[in-house]
């Protein structure tokens, strides 16, 4: 199954990187690498997660959650959210 990042999700990831990089650029790089590494697992195991219509993937060791949905031929990454943030209305 292919993995597709929506522009919104990439914007969330970019914002998380920029926020962390203000204090520690190396930590920001590590965070993004860790998120990508975990999300790549969705290609083989797309049914991880728990919300009907969407699923959530907690990035261990961070405060981030990746929201995604499984389509016929791809896994669509919808958002990268900090766990302390208010959950968006569309989810």
Q: Locations of the language-model features?
A:
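Enriched for short, Lys/Arg-rich terminal
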Residues: 65, 69-91
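Basic, Lys/Arg-enriched alpha-helical interface segments
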Residues: 2-54, 71, 90
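Short hydrophobic/aromatic beta-strand or adjacent loop that forms the aromatic wall/cage
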Residues: 54, 63-65
């Amino acid at each position: 199954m292919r993995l597709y990042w929506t522009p919104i999700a990439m914007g969330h990831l970019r914002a998380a990187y920029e926020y962390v990089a203000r204090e520690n650029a190396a930590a920001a790089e590590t965070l993004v690498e860790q998120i990508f590494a975990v999300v790549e697992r969705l290609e083989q195991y797309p049914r991880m997660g728990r919300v009907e219509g969407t699923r959530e993937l907690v990035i261990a060791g961070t405060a981030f959650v990746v929201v995604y949905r499984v389509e016929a031929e791809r896994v669509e990454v919808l958002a990268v959210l900090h766990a302390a943030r208010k959950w968006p209305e569309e989810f």
